[in-house]
Structure formats: structure tokens, C-alpha cells
Swiss-Prot record:
Coiled coil: none annotated. InterPro entries: HutG, Ureohydrolase, Ureohydrolase_dom_sf. The keyword Signal does not apply. This is Formimidoylglutamase. GO terms for molecular function: agmatinase activity; formimidoylglutamase activity; manganese ion binding. Keywords: Histidine metabolism, Hydrolase, Manganese, Metal-binding. It comes from Salmonella typhi. Mn(2+) 1 binds at H130, D155, D159, D241. Its cofactor is Mn(2+). Pathway: Amino-acid degradation; L-histidine degradation into L-glutamate; L-glutamate from N-formimidoyl-L-glutamate (hydrolase route): step 1/1. Mn(2+) 2 binds at D155, H157, D241, D243.
Length: 313
């Protein structure tokens, strides 16, 4: 059974510069850490949650270790400067999945996300493998059942695989099937896709599903496509698989990208999403601290989370 645990206060530590000025503060001083999962107490805040699960990565023959991602990212965030938007972050702890119950873990995350959104919060989830996306996305669909939900994925992989059970490579096929079951449109855009990492069958599935696909080679000039996708939906769920970044910026993932999309381009693509007023949920997935020797990759991932919270409108 999936268990919920509050985040350890030891993760939120940093240098205290408050003697310099009242606003010389860092995230460890402005993030609120909750000892109970009760989102109804935190309306209009951003729920920071961890999904400590890499069972989907294991099933997908990937490199395990992403279950340690949420706490590693908290530590990297803690000492970053606190600016506008960061005071809204409330740490609502981790959902910890026992092996091999991926499906139960995804259901627990789905229920938690839906509860947060219905309570008036927004959700920022730290994975975990990209199996995070099915639980997170399903929770968003549940919370906004009468509105069109757009799923924006920055990822080297389409993650539309067809297998006999859920993995880190199946979440968007699962979400498509959920939309089919609910008789609603499946709005999915994937930016940063590597043609070399996706079979022809996956490209065919994306075409059949009317997925907006932008290859890694074309992301330098993709703002118009991003804006067009934003404009056609009511609510947005943004998911960032860190393997969209090039290996020299992000080696600490299950499947490092030989080419990838540089961090600065990723930031330029997500800025209009964050500022759109439509973003309800976001996540960072696939960070694997086992392959981050000096903490540099954690800081790269944390900068993405920092920027999302700062830009979020």
C-alpha cells in the first residue's frame, strides 16, 4: 500500500542571510512544510509533492534510482533565493510506492492531485519516473472534468508505448485511453522529441492521436506552436522529463539524451505556459541522484522547478 510521509525538515536547510535585509531570504525560509496532508488548509497555494517511485522505470528496462529524486531536489531547492511566487510553496510530503505496486501508487497520486486541485491549490510534483505522469495527469482530468485539459510534455520520448502493463514509457497512452473512456478530447503536445529514440510505430501512434510533435532539432523556433497549443485549451498540465536536456546538462536520468534541448531553450518554451493563467499542474520527472556525482544535475533540475514557481500565474 502506498504510504504518505511528510518531508524531513533536514532537507530544508541553507545559509541564513536575513541579517543583511528582511528580504534576503532563501527557499528553506519561505517554503511551508506541512506535517499532515490536508490541502483544504492551503487554498491558492502551490502543493509541492514528491512521488518516490521508479517501478515504471524498472519495468521499462531503465536505470532505477529516480525514487530518490524528490528529496534530492528538495535539498537543491532549499538554498536558492526566494523571490515572488516562492512564498506560495507548501511542501505536502512524499507518496512512497512499495515495489511492485505501481498501479496502486499511481492511484494514490491521482487521488491526492485531484484533492489538491479541488481545494484550490495547484500542484508541483517531483518524481519519480515518468510513470508519475499518469497519476498526476489523471488527477488533473478528474478535477477539471468539464473543461478541456492540455498536456504539454517536454521529453525526448513520446511515451505512447503499448505494453501489457504500465511503465514509464506508457503514461500518455494511458491518459489517451482515459480520455477515450471519459468521451473527452485528448490534447497532447510533446516538445523535444528525438526521432532516434522513438520507433516508427510510436510516430504513427502520435499521428493517429493528433499529437502536436516538435522534434529536438526544431525547438529553437517552436514558440508559435507552443502558443497555438496553449490557446486551444482551458487548463494545462505541464510535465518535464529531464531527459529532454542534453547529457552534458543532465546526465542523472535513466536515458540521457545525446542531443537534447538546452536548458535555456526549455525555459523559453515553458515561460508562456507558466504565465498563461491556465497552468494547474506541473512536474519534473526522471531525476536519478545515483548518477549525479557532484550535485550539479540536481541544481539544473531545481532551477526548472524554481523558475516554474516564480513565473506561475
Amino acid at each position: 500500500m502506498t504510504q504518505w510521509y511528510p518531508a524531513s525538515p533536514a532537507l530544508w536547510q541553507g545559509r541564513d542571510d536575513s541579517i543583511e535585509a528582511p528580504d534576503a531570504r532563501r527557499l528553506f525560509q519561505t517554503v511551508t512544510r506541512s506535517e499532515a496532508f490536508f490541502p483544504e488548509n492551503w487554498q491558492q497555494k502551490i502543493a509541492l509533492m514528491g512521488f518516490a517511485c521508479d517501478e515504471g522505470v524498472k519495468r521499462n528496462s531503465g536505470r532505477p534510482g529516480a525514487a530518490g529524486g524528490p528529496d534530492a531536489l528538495r535539498k537543491a531547492l532549499a538554498n536558492m533565493a526566494s523571490h515572488q511566487g516562492h512564498e506560495r510553496l507548501v511542501d505536502l510530503g512524499n507518496w512512497v510506492a512499495p515495489t511492485p505496486d505501481l498501479e496502486g501508487a499511481q492511484q494514490a497520486l491521482r487521488d491526492a492531485v485531484s484533492r489538491c486541485l479541488r481545494a484550490g491549490m495547484r500542484t508541483l510534483v517531483m518524481g519519480g519516473g515518468h510513470e508519475t505522469a499518469f497519476g498526476h495527469g489523471a488527477g488533473v482530468l478528474d478535477a477539471f472534468a468539464q473543461e478541456s485539459v492540455g498536456i504539454i510534455n517536454l521529453d525526448a520520448h513520446l511515451d505512447l508505448r503499448q505494453t501489457d502493463r504500465a511503465t514509464s514509457g506508457t503514461p500518455f497512452r494511458q491518459l489517451a485511453q482515459l480520455c477515450d473512456a471519459q468521451s473527452r478530447a485528448f490534447h497532447y503536445a510533446c516538445f523535444g522529441v528525438s526521432r532516434a529514440a522513438n520507433t516508427q510505430a510510436l510516430w504513427r501512434e502520435a499521428q493517429w492521436r493528433n499529437v502536436t510533435v516538435v522534434e529536438d532539432l526544431d525547438c529553437h523556433d517552436a514558440l508559435a506552436q507552443m502558443t497555438q497549443f496553449i490557446d486551444k485549451v482551458d487548463k494545462i498540465y505541464l510535465t518535464i522529463d529531464l531527459d529532454v536536456l542534453p547529457v552534458w546538462e543532465m546526465p542523472a536520468v535513466s536515458a540521457p539524451a545525446a542531443l537534447g534541448v538546452p536548458l535555456i531553450q526549455v525555459l523559453r518554451l515553458i515561460e508562456p505556459v507558466c504565465r498563461s493563467g491556465k497552468l494547474q499542474a506541473a512536474d519534473l520527472v526522471e531525476f536519478n541522484p545515483r548518477f549525479d556525482e557532484d550535485g550539479a544535475a540536481a541544481r539544473v533540475a531545481a532551477r526548472l522547478g524554481w523558475q516554474i514557481a516564480h513565473w506561475w500565474r
